[in-house]
Design a protein with these regions (language model features):
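Alpha-helical substrate-binding/gating segment
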Residues: 156-170, 178-201
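Rossmann-fold cofactor-recognition segment
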Residues: 13-25
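Conserved cofactor-binding/catalytic machinery of classical short-chain dehydrogenase/reductase
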Residues: 25, 40, 66-69, 80, ...
C-alpha cells in the first residue's frame, strides 16, 4: 500500500508536478503514466538491504512484483525504464578485484536476490518486448539530506547525526573493512545521464 512520508518535500516538491502511486498496484502506475504523459520511468522502489533482510516477503513484493508492474506499463505505454541494481547482487564467490560486468552472482541476502532478479527481468523485457530498460550497479549511496534508513552504508551518515546530537556512536563495521560508497547527487546524475543517452550506445 501507500507509504506515509513518500511525498516529495521542499525543493523537490516545488520543482514540478508530482503524484503518488503504489508500485505494487499496476493500475495506479498506469494511471500516473497516462495522466502525466511519462516517457521514462525511474523505478527506485525497493527496501534497503537491512530492512529487506528482516522483511523478505515485502522486499520481493515491492522489488520484483513492483518491477513487473512497471515493466508491463512501460511495454504497454512505450516508456523507457531505469531500475538501479547494486553491488549487493554479487556474492562471496564473485571476483573481488577487477570484477567483470558479466560474472557469477550468488548473493546471500534477499536484497541481493531481488537485484539479480531485477537485472534478469529487465533484460527479458528488453529482449522479448523491446522495452528500453537500463540499470547501473550502484554501491552504497549516502546523502547529507536523507537520514539513515536501513542501508548497509547508513553508518557513514549516522555517525555524523550522532556527533551533532552529542551522542556516542559505536561503528558496526569491523576496523579495516572497505566499503564502496557514492554520494546521492552523483548517483542521481549518473541515472539521468544514462537515460538521456541514445539507446544505441
Amino acid at each position: 500500500g501507500y507509504i506515509p512520508g513518500a511525498e516529495p518535500k521542499g525543493e523537490l516538491k516545488e520543482s514540478g508536478p508530482s503524484a503518488i502511486a503504489d508500485v505494487t498496484d499496476a493500475q495506479a502506475v498506469a494511471s500516473v503514466v497516462k495522466e502525466y504523459h511519462i516517457d521514462t520511468i525511474y523505478n527506485l522502489a525497493a527496501l534497503l538491504s537491512v530492512v529487506a533482510e528482516s522483511k523478505p516477503k515485502l522486499a520481493w513484493k515491492i522489488g520484483i512484483d513492483g518491477l513487473w508492474n512497471v515493466l508491463e506499463v512501460a511495454r504497454e505505454q512505450g516508456c523507457a525504464v531505469f531500475t538501479p541494481s547494486s553491488i549487493g547482487s554479487f556474492g562471496a564467490s564473485t571476483p573481488h578485484t577487477k570484477t567483470p560486468q558479466d560474472t557469477i552472482q550468488r548473493p546471500r541476502t534477499m536484497y541481493g536476490v531481488t537485484k539479480v532478479t531485477t537485472e534478469l527481468l529487465s533484460d527479458y523485457y528488453f529482449n522479448k518486448y523491446g522495452v528500453d530498460t537500463r540499470a547501473v550497479r550502484f554501491p552504497g549511496i549516502i546523502s547529507n539530506v536523507t537520514p539513515p534508513g536501513g542501508g548497509t552504508t547508513d553508518y557513514a551518515v549516522d555517525i555524523y547525526y550522532s556527533a551533532v546530537k552529542g551522542e556516542k556512536f559505536v561503528c558496526p563495521i569491523k576496523q579495516g573493512t572497505l566499503m564502496d560508497m557514492m554520494y546521492m547527487p552523483d548517483a542521481l546524475n549518473a541515472a539521468i545521464t544514462l537515460m538521456e543517452a541514445e539507446s544505441e550506445r
